[in-house]
């Protein structure tokens, strides 16, 4: 045949070519839920009497690689089966051109033997004769119990059978056999749906996603009471999912001339012939996928103050904390009990509180102890629980270390029974604090903290009065519906802390810490704050008055919990020049701050308040010098009034950048320049004389606490260095760096080199300098960067 005459045959071959397909199943859930699905599959257990047969497709269309994935799915499913002769029996049959029994159901009596046998199955190849394999099973499961127990058939195939499957599959289902169709490689979903039992959504899975497929299989079996979960709070939920197929289809692209022979001798006809192009098109099939979800360690939202909870397995987690709260277990502010006190936590363990409420109470005490107790603390703690009877789990002070106390707390069991709060209070009054019988100044203050979520079933007024008569301070923590009863027990509304939502319970920790000591220091101990004092050290103030200012700010500092996680304090003085006495991150403790304040220099000369405020904006209130993103910031300026003529604009610039400014002006006359500098009326405190400063201390603390509670803008002041731009996004921020800089805060100069890890070790090219100290990331940001890169 002439070559030209072969063209039609070639075109016909292309036209009728079978196109390849790519299939995929995707469950539409977030990453956290996907992690819970994976964890839940490890918490499920099938221990009922049941016969399970794996029917593995070993044909050439599967291929050896996909066959190994089929075996991996079968092995993973066996991990949840209680395999024994009297409970779960497992067998395996491979099919290709013909079915081949790998091992019957009565061959092995342990899970490990079954898993080893599945692992040793050899791929055989051949045609995909699914129908023949199903017909063989019509005579019964090899080694099975003849239908006296439920029968489960798990078909793992690509759904490309070369024979009919609908009738033999229907016959098996009519005999009561539950059929799962598990796709592998690029399955045909329509054939899998034909094979599977009803409801189809619960019996069609994809073996390529082993943990998801195992969860789906066990979830369906649990609805038939064949499987259970270790946690009673686990539940089966439907999730939208999508089965997608990427099909290659042909489209008419146009016509071209081709030559054909004719009936007339020596004649060739030129005719238009169509030609085609190939195009890939997604075909989607929406469905519901039923999966078991178990409560995760992050469901209780243990990370406070905007921290992000990262689960680590079934019951462990860690918190990614904002910079202001780094280093703490649950991003909790560092608090302390500085008074000498004995505290007994009394936990309601009755049926009215429920197991969930009892666990919340234990979590509350655990967080409180972790937040406030130190090894050198003068406070001692004990823990007791009650329902029908009182049980003292940890007598007051009888523990070696805080971790020992926490371990004892974790081991306290839930007792149930009636809520006999009155009886518990009587026993606590008599025996709750051991043999401590000292009185007066020799005995620490004794406090009982009652945590309950249910009303007492016995009388409480008399026992509570008896406890208070024995010099016990009673504090009550509970829900709003119990407020009246808690007031009756404690004797005062001031001794009651209520919450509207169970999760709000944990927000009471700072308030409880404040109330425990007999003389709680006023202020906002739990509020984070970056605070800078600006002192006028010019000649117009004088050395003696400057000393009065120093004494005043030292007394104010005593009202704050100074540490890198709560309140940071800096000090700037100005006169003949502007000088930073110490920055925000210079001194991590209150004692060090007080000592440095006493050593601040008196400068003399003529001062410029405007220059000093600009110095604070450029050299003090920056992330390079210790300011923390997302933490309220305030400047308290103490001045005699002179030198304030140029300060109004710099003060307004600070306020526009998210930094609050309060002016304390000392002198008989309030100058107009100071009024303009103060801005809003509530940002000015006028003091008649330097000796009167202590009388305005409470007013200053109240203003600072009010500013500390205001919402903050994470980009004001900007945490981005080297002229980077701060962009708010989803409750956080990111830095867009200018050319030549990179890093979370644009702190790293981009150098030439093959790998980022090698840049810091390369010799810098001539004329190219590394970042100056002001351009480098401050310590607290470098730590954050190291953590993020480690992740």
Curated annotation (Swiss-Prot):
Any one GO biological process: calcium-independent cell-matrix adhesion
Superkingdom is: Eukaryota
- What GO MF terms are annotated? calcium ion binding; identical protein binding
* Matching Gene3D superfamilies: Laminin, von Willebrand factor, type A domain
Q: Any signal peptide, and if so, which residues? A: 1-23
**What InterPro entries does the database record attribute to this sequence?**
ECM_Assembly_Org (IPR050525), EGF-like_Ca-bd_dom (IPR001881), EGF-like_CS (IPR013032), EGF-like_dom (IPR000742), VWF_A (IPR002035), vWFA_dom_sf (IPR036465)
CDD domains, per this entry?
Answer: EGF, EGF_CA, vWA_collagen
Q: Which residue numbers delimit the VWFA domain?
A: 51-221, 342-516, 530-704
Localization, UniProt: Secreted
**Which cysteine residues pair off into disulfide bonds?**
298-309, 303-319, 321-331, 715-726, 720-735, 737-746
Q: Which residues form the EGF-like domain?
A: 295-332, 711-747
Free-text tissue specificity from the UniProt record = Detected in uterus, kidney, and skin. Also detected in intestine and lung of adult mice, and in calvaria, femur, brain, heart, intestine, skeletal muscle, and lung of newborn mice.
The region called Disordered is annotated at 762-791
Spell out the GO cellular component terms annotated for this protein, sorted alphabetically and separated by semicolons: basement membrane; extracellular region; extracellular space
Provide the residues annotated with a glycan attachment (glycosylation).
Answer: 146
Q: Which keywords does this Swiss-Prot/TrEMBL entry list?
A: Disulfide bond, EGF-like domain, Glycoprotein, Repeat, Secreted, Signal
- SUPFAM superfamilies given in the database record: EGF/Laminin, vWA-like
Q: What is its main location?
A: secreted
Q: How does it assemble?
A: Forms monomers and multimers.
- In Swiss-Prot or TrEMBL terms, this protein is called von Willebrand factor A domain-containing protein 2
Q: Which gene encodes it?
A: Vwa2
